[in-house]
C-alpha cells in the first residue's frame, strides 16, 4: 500500500513538472505597444530619492549606437536596475553620462531632468514615429532592425571609445537541434549578432564557447529570460516570431 | 523508511534543479575596477573570530612582480590554497616576508614593545569600512587604460615606467644570471574563423619569470600541452591568471591578434 501511494506521489510530481514546462513553453509574455517595446523603467532608488524613476528607450538609442557600446564599453548590465548607475557617476562621465554630457547629447542640467526622470511618461511615442521609415516585422517594435542595419537605413556606431574599432569577422552559422521531436531545429547566425554585439556580451557567461556544452539551454529557460531570452524577450525581436530562429516552422 | 528517503531524494532533486537553473544562462555582474583581482582568504579567520583577509592584487602588483610572491614566497595560484597561518607570517613566511615592520606594517611584537593591533584590520578587512592608504582611483588615474578588469593596462604602465616592479626580496630571492627569453610565437586557433594567437614570452616574463608557468601549467615542449578556450574560461592554463587577475580572456583580440587570412 505504501509503495502504491509512493508511486502515485512521484507520478503526480512528474505530471505537474511536465504541465509546468508546457504552460511556460506556450505562455509568451504579452507584448506592449510597439513604441513601448524595449523601454526599461529604472527605479532602483525610487522611494529613497526625490527624483522620479528613469525611463530608457532602447529603440531611440539603438539607431545611434550598437548594443555593444552600452552593454560592453559602458558596462551596463543586461537587466534593469542591475547596474549601479548614480547621478554622481553620470556626472563623472560614466554610464549615461558618457554621452549625456551636454556635448554628445543633452546633459545633466536642470532643464533636462524630466527627459529621463519621468516615471516612464516619456516622449518615446513621438520619437518612435520618427522611425516609421524602417522595414517592418510583425512583433516587438515592429521594426526589422537587422534589415534596417544591413540596408544602411540606420548607421549605429560600434564604439565610442575607439575610433579605429573593427569588429572581428565571425560568420559561423550554428545549427541547433530542438529537444522536442516535432519541432524543426533552430539556426544561430553569428554574423547577425556580431554586428550589434561584442563576443563578450554572450561568451562565456551566457553561452559556453564550446559547441553543445551549454547546459539547460532550452525554451523553458529562454522564456525565463535566460540564454537567448536575455535579449529576445524584451529588447531584440521577441520569441513570438518562431520562424525567425526555427526557419522551417510556420508562424 | 526507504520510501520516505526516496521521496526526500525526489524533492531534493526538484529543489536543486530549480536553484541551479538560477545561476546559468545570464550575464554575471562584472567586478568594479577596484574590486578586480581582490581575493578573500578565509581558511582560519572566521573560525578564530576575525574578519577574513581581503588581498588586493592591484596594490601589490604596482610594486612587485607576480613571480616574487607566487614563486619565491610560495603563494599558490588559487585563493585559500596556500593555507597561510598567522604564525607563518610572524615567522617571516608568506605575507610576513614583507609585513614584518621593516618593509611594511606588521602586528608582530617588535623589540619587546606592545604589538600594534591597529594594523590587524588593514588586512582582516572583509565587511569593515577600511580606508586604504592608497586610493585606487586616485592611484590609477594617469595610467594607460584597458577595457576590463582594473581598466588599467598594467603592461604598458610598466613599460612607461609608471610602476617599477621589484623582483628581488633580500633573504628570500636568489639572484641568477639573466636568461634570454624565447621569441614570440603563434598558436593556431582551433576554430578557422578566429585569428591565431600571438604569444609573447617576453611580455609574460617581465612579471612571471619562467617558473610561474613552467612546467606545471604548461609543459615546455611546444604544442604538447593540449588546451582549449573553454578550459581557459574555467580557470585553467592561461585562465590561471587571465580572468581573475591579469586581463580577462573576454577581450578576444588582445590574444587573437594575427591578421585575418
Identify the role of each PLM range.
Chain A
Residues 1-4:
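Positively charged n-region of N-terminal signal peptides that target proteins for export
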Residues 8-16:
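Bacterial N-terminal signal peptides
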